[in-house]
Amino acid sequence: MLSAIPNIITSIRFLLVIPISVYIYQGNDLLALTLFIGAGLSDGLDGYLARKYNWISKFGQFLDPLADKFLIVGTLLALAFTNKLPLWFVYTMISRDGIVLVGSTLYLLLFESSAALPNRWGKHYTGWTIALFIIVLLRASFEIFPVYLEYIAMAGVLFYIILSVVSYLRKEGKEIFKQIS
């Protein structure tokens, strides 16, 4: 029974996407920020518990990255629709995720392997994205943070979008193109 705790935490993070997005739409950015930080901390907690107590499950390995992606995309769209992030930036982020999603699906279908795991640049991209969302919500809540902090975080996200996509295309993309040629 205790072994289900990481999956329960992950499921809660999955469900938090809805209130986070709603609070951003309503302009209740501080509450959205609080829930977003809680969701982010839960990501570390579920992974820690699963590894420490060997509560790793196939379901958890599937659900955890899905919950992370829903949290990021849900928050991204809410920030876009409330004009807290520029649309060109949102399209760039969604395009990156689309490239990785299509590539991962092709890789899985062609090689029947999930070896196309997130690379270190993708993990940095996620970290910078989370930092950006926190900065945007902090600025919207308190208006005391200078806008250049957002620009620095956006530059970091863009940098890791480029690195992660190039790295992905050089490795998994090369194998996919060899297979279909």
What are these regions (language model features)?
Residues M1-S181:
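Alpha-helical transmembrane bundles and membrane-interface segments of multipass inner-membrane proteins
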